[in-house]
């Protein structure tokens, strides 16, 4: 993290809202420049340099975990000259242009305000991607070639110019300050406000901003990105689990573009049974990390155990593998269902990791209601004709209208339609 206390203090004093972006940049400028210099020294590269560039990610650092609520920007520092420097440095043109097109899209969405805000809006970047994939006769983003990715960058920047009236920023520090202020702004986005209201998190806490040197999971077949949990967040079972994707980055794991693979062999076999995939096809096309990257898996498994023992709670972790080397991006106490909350607290107590008082404090009264939700009869579930499968956002079983947009759900609920 480049800075946290200064950023949090700025928000606590409401200076960001009252003084505006320019004043905030002035207040934080010296601290950020010094911290960037320190990261440059550690990474032996230079921010904005053409020959030996440092790329960074910019993400939130709120004191309370708010998974998925705040905005993140990856690959910051790229422009038309820097991307050529990355190619010269790595010898991997596809990786460089793939990172560039991801950056322009993410920056356009988060910083330049081009992300759709309602169901009527069309995402200009996704529309362009689908158009290019269709013209090239491919289905997946990772099937696009270097020339296709170059075309995407060109069309993305044209879309930015058309929608904002300005050229896409090329100065690394201009990009950085835009991203920092966008993360501050995301503290007050609608989903973050609603999440804080549900979780009882005060608005005045604010968020810090973390700027980290990039590591890349999209450098080829020896690279990957993933998320994992030291215990099952749904049931509380003491079972290491998670998902990963080879040659991918950031939100690819949860974006639904490609089918993620399981971290453990047991998890992969469980997934295959639920998905109706034979063992031969699973092993050939969807191997677990334990099978495909055994040495990385052993290191990851050892580290997740070490982290849980240190924090004495179930951990939610994000990681990247860059050309065979494992990097941890973050760890936090994982969110869990009511049933998992009780089981994890009791298991940690029995395992001697926490005492009775701590176990009781881990049980949130408002989540006990989840234990009373109706559930499917297991025997009936086995006989059910399943139309599709997915990851549940809440516990229990439900019947009713399928709703694809949050606005529709709120509107229909107000009209007593659901």
Task: Tell what function each PLM region has.
Residues 12-235, 247, 260, 270-271, ...:
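Extended, highly charged
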């Amino acid at each position: 993290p480049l800075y946290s206390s200064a950023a949090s203090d700025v928000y606590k004093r409401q200076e960001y809202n009252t003084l505006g972006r320019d004043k905030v940049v002035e207040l934080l400028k010296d601290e950020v420049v010094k911290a960037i210099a320190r990261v440059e020294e550690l990474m032996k590269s230079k921010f904005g340099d053409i020959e030996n560039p440092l790329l960074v990610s910019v993400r939130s650092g709120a004191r309370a975990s708010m998974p998925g609520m705040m905005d993140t920007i990856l690959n910051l520092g790229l422009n038309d000259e820097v991307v050529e420097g990355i190619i010269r440095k790595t010898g991997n043109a596809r990786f460089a242009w793939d990172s560039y097109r991801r950056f322009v899209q993410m920056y356009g969405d988060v910083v330049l305000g081009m992300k759709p805000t309602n169901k009527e809006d069309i995402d200009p970047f996704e529309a362009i991607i689908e158009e290019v994939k269709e013209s090239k006769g491919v289905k997946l983003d990772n099937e696009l070639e270097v020339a296709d990715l170059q075309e995407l960058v060109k069309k993305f920047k044209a879309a930015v110019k058309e929608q904002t009236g300005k050229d896409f920023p090329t100065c690394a520090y201009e990009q950085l300050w835009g991203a920092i202020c966008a993360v501050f702004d995301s503290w007050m986005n609608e989903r973050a406000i609603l999440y804080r209201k549900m979780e009882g998190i005060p608005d005045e806490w604010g968020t810090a901003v973390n700027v980290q040197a990039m590591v890349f999971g999209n450098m080829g077949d020896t690279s990957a990105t993933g998320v994992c949990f030291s215990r099952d967040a749904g049931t509380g079972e003491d079972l290491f689990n998670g998902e990963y994707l080879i040659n991918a980055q950031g939100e690819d794991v949860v974006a639904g573009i490609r089918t993620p693979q399981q971290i453990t062999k047991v998890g992969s076999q469980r997934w295959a049974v639920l998905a109706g995939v034979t063992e031969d096809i699973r092993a050939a096309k969807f191997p677990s990390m334990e099978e495909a990257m055994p040495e990385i898996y052993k290191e990851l498994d050892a580290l997740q155990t070490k982290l849980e023992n240190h924090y004495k709670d179930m951990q939610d972790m994000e990681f990247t593998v860059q050309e065979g080397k494992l990097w941890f991006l973050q760890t936090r106490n994982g969110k869990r269902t009511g049933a998992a909350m009780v089981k994890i607290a009791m298991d940690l107590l029995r395992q001697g990791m926490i005492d009775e008082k701590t176990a009781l404090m881990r049980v949130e009264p408002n989540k006990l209601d989840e234990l009373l939700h109706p559930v499917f009869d297991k025997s009936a579930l086995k006989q059910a004709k399943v139309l599709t499968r997915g990851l549940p956002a809440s516990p229990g079983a439900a019947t009713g209208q399928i709703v694809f947009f949050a606005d529709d759900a709120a509107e229909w609920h107000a009209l007593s339609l659901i």
